[in-house]
Amino acid sequence: MDTAIIEVALPLAVPGTFHYRVPPELQAQVAVGREVVVPFGRRRLSGSIVAVGSELPADLAASIRDVLEITPGEPLFSGVHLTFFRWLSSYYLTSLGDVIRTALPGGTRSVTRRLARLTEAGARALTEKAASGEEGEVLALLRDDPGLGLARIRRRFPDRDVRRICDRLRRQGLILWEDGLRGPQAAPRRLRVVRALVPPGREVAELKPREREILDQLAAGPRLLRDLEGQVKNLAYWIRKLVAHRLVQVASEEVYRDPAGPPIIEAGSAPRLTPEQEGAVRAVSEALRDGVFSSFLLHGVTGSGKTEVYLAATAVALDLGRQTLVLVPEIALTARLEALFRQRFQSRVAILHSGLGRGERRDEWMRIRRGEAPVVLGARSAIFAPLERLGLIVVDEEHDASYKEERGLRYHARDAAVMRAKLTGAVVLMGSATPALSSFQNALQGKFRLLQLPHRIDQRPLPGVAVIDMRQQKSGTVISPPLRHALADTLAAG
């Protein structure tokens, strides 16, 4: 395949993509999903590769320009996700570049910064000693270290008005400002990891007690060096001895930042389902095994056990080698479901929402991208999760208006979930005690299959509701006497 020409999506409010030529020295790095820096008019912009080996339109052959940079590292999305991104672009009338910018979490994207570079005139001025003083010093710095940002130049000359000097040099044509990639906003976290080179159970002769203690600690798997420091006295000395005898290895490795921490509850078994829950799970399971697109609306009263249906369906998807995406309308609602899903599926669960730090978002995205977390739980933006083998999408509280994004790419996560499931042959399961009218109508018309849980677990009654006519209370009263007495009783009961 000819990889000399690529298509790039740029985050601009213009339709279409742009063709660029890849220089020979960069062609080995080309892949869909990689970030690139390209010239665009007089600017340098960062975008994403969306096609490789494209046929160049005849009218562009003479004017095509070269790619300037390609970011190292893994691609951030694949062709599977690109199909979904293109649909979003077409349906919501947003450029493909803007869709991709919205989809990729902040911690994964590279950022551009303004870099100062010498022009040919600037290089001549230095050679001919036409520039002197503070201007000459800045030019000499840029000659020795090309491509510096304003902050880096300020650090070298803290007592100078660097911005004024650079503006003067730019007006004289001695330097120019360009956009360059600075790398991801959040870099991988690397820590020192110790791993045993001796197979578990194999006896090693002439070990000191401390050495045997360390090997026993490593029998279950690699450990962070910092975690062992508080458990073994004089650890550094004993580690050096074990390394010298080739019994352990110490290396700097990428370690994920975990937004939730290790599960504090042991993995639990699934409770026994009610007949109504069993019927719902059976229907979803059959669709999962068929491996074709299906959509379900789970209408269940509050307390009827919809969450347990989600958990059981997720277990079926995992058994089939497929992945599950669970959407909730708001970040605040993720905590409850997160505890339940992590209890059932432990470290296989990843969390995605804007409340995470950039580093956490980057690490969770990469865990999902690498297939290490087959269950993803998150708010609206988790619909973009880079799942390659998506089998089930759960949309909890599908009626909630928070699924609608009101800025930028104005997508509705529930509607996007239905289309993503359709594009990937997955099953979408939407649940609510009060379904949206549009969803319920779709179910009545047969577009969605209606599943119902009309009864609460153990036939528990719904909480009583009393309507108080506040017109009968004194003017200015906010809390009625019955509510005040109920609050007092609740506080007294602890």
Show where each model-derived region lies.
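Accessory, non-ATPase domains that flank or precede helicase/AAA+ motor cores in DNA-metabolism machines
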Residues: 1-432, 439, 444-460, 492-493
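Conserved interdomain hinge at the start of the Helicase C-terminal
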Residues: 474-494
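Short amphipathic
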Residues: 464-471
